[in-house]
């Protein structure tokens, strides 16, 4: 996925009210742009740090742009726009990059399902049945480690999705939790038990119930982002 028009570089001033970010462009322009991430963004918010944003020319938009990429304290690039994860995964599914899920005949988005009135990110239809795929965007990394972690904040919604997937798996339906790791320099992903122990427990329970747990890494640059490799998932 290439950024078109190209992203613009800026310096982060602050993020506030969850969805607002103040930046200074390389030309000295001060802007308030949209922050498309509801998480804590623990390692993605460095005041004065380098960021990249997409600018909108839509006169109906209240804000002139969207924060897309941040440079972390470890020098990695993180795609902080969580909406990109589903776009990247769909692109990878259609290109056959996620080999475990190849062979589907139809792809449907945001399909209602489950006991708790959820919507699955993707339902893939195969000749012998359907697979339900839940996508999570991962950007949390640590100094001196090539292992990313999810979540970066307590997520009751994420735990609910795991319960829904586990219920499907127990019924013999193929259920998949897919982590889209939008952070460069990563080899594996794990549950962030130190941040949300309940989510970590729900993930292990879902795996025991038969849910497939996959992780794929994204090559992140300021020009292009794309899913390019499978990563290990560490649950022990």
UniProtKB/Swiss-Prot annotation:
Molecular functions (GO terms): DNA binding
Family under the similarity heading: Belongs to the SfsA family.
Name assigned to this protein: Sugar fermentation stimulation protein homolog
Species lineage: Bacteria, Pseudomonadati, Pseudomonadota, Gammaproteobacteria, Pseudomonadales
Underlying gene: sfsA
Pfam family, one: SfsA
Residues spanning the membrane: none
InterPro entries: SfsA, SfsA_C, SfsA_N
Domain of life: Bacteria
């Amino acid at each position: 996925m290439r950024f078109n028009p190209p992203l613009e570089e800026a310096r982060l001033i602050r993020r506030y009210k969850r969805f607002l970010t103040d930046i200074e462009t390389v030309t000295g322009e001060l802007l308030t742009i949209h922050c498309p991430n509801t998480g804590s963004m623990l390692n993605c918010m460095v005041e004065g740090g380098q960021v990249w944003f997409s600018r909108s020319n839509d006169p109906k938009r209240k804000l002139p742009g969207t924060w897309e990429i941040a440079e972390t304290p470890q020098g990695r690039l993180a795609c902080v726009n969580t909406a990109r994860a589903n776009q990247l995964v769909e692109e990878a599914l259609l290109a056959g990059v996620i080999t475990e899920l190849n062979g589907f005949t139809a792809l449907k988005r945001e399909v209602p399902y489950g006991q708790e009135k959820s919507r699955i990110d993707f339902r893939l239809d195969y000749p012998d049945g359907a697979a339900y795929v839940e996508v999570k965007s991962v950007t949390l990394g640590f100094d001196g480690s090539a292992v990313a972690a999810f979540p970066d904040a307590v997520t009751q919604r994420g735990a609910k999705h795991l319960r829904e997937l586990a219920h499907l798996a127990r019924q013999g339906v193929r259920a998949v939790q897919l982590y889209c790791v939008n952070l460069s320099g990563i080899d594996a992903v794990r549950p962030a038990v130190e941040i949300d122990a309940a989510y970590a427990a729900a993930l292990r329970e879902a795996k025991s119930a038969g849910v497939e747990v996959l992780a794929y890494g994204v090559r992140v640059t300021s020009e292009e982002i794309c899913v390019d490799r499978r990563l290990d998932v560490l649950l022990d």
